[in-house]
């Protein structure tokens, strides 16, 4: 997460090569920062800096490859295992898909529905970013891409809050947004209490949270981050919130 924040910091300082290096390292360390390439590309496009965008992407790819290629060549099975797991896994803890299944709402062909939904949401985000009155800083919009990645995924791991919160903090524009921020954090606390009580049932404990309660806590968590994200996006759309033309 530190390397991701450094990539965002240097990008907004217009130190694109340094940012590209850190983003490449970030993607190599944990794959999720790859979703930042969408808002980055939109910012370059809106700023008419297409050549800089290609250079940025090349820099990030070089440093990603410098870390990944040697490992892939020497320990391919271990390197590929992460990608294989995410391709083959079904609906898992924390995801909206798992919550719906607990509520007896079955989603057929999840391996098709999940990527299609993700594509639709990312296309929607791209349209939103292109229609903003002014071009925002990366710090203001990085969270949006990560929220799509985490909430639409087949798993919503507990550690995702460690990824989302720093990006949420740097995206805050005014004190009024703190209301929805703390509401979201309250739903996260509720979820983290709920999942351990739900997992207790798997160990034949005499206490625990029923599946329906855990499903509601899961959906409440997604609702919390969605409301916060909506507030940020709404405020950013106001003409007076632009960063640059």
Residues of each region from the PLM?
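Luminal/periplasmic active-site loops of membrane-embedded glycosylation enzymes
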Residues: 81-106, 217-218
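Multi-pass membrane glycosyltransferase architecture that uses lipid-linked
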Residues: 1-81, 110-245
């Amino acid at each position: 997460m530190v390397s991701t924040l450094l990539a965002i910091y240097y990008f907004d300082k217009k130190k694109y090569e340094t940012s590209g290096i850190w983003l490449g390292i970030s993607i190599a360390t944990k794959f999720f920062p790859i979703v930042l390439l969408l808002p980055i590309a939109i910012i370059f496009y809106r700023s008419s800096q297409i050549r800089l965008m290609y250079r940025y992407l090349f820099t990030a790819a070089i440093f990603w490859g410098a870390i990944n290629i040697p490992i892939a060549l020497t320990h391919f099975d271990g390197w590929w295992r992460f990608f294989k797991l995410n391709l083959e896994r079904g609906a898992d803890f924390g995801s909206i898909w798992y919550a719906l299944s607990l509520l007896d709402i079955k989603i057929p062909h999840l391996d098709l529905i999940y990527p299609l939904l993700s594509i639709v949401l990312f296309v929607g985000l791209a349209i939103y970013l292109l229609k903003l009155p002014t071009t925002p800083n990366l710090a203001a919009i990085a969270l949006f891409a990560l929220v799509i990645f985490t909430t639409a995924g087949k798993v919503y791991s507990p550690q995702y809050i460690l990824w989302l919160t720093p990006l949420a903090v740097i995206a805050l524009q005014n004190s009024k947004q703190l209301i929805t921020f703390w509401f979201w954090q309250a739903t996260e606390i509720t979820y983290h209490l709920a999942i351990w009580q739900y997992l207790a049932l798997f160990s034949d404990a005499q206490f625990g949270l029923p599946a329906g309660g855990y499903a509601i806590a899961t959906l409440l968590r997604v609702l919390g981050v969605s409301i916060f994200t909506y507030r940020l996006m709404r405020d950013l759309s106001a003409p007076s919130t632009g960063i640059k033309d």
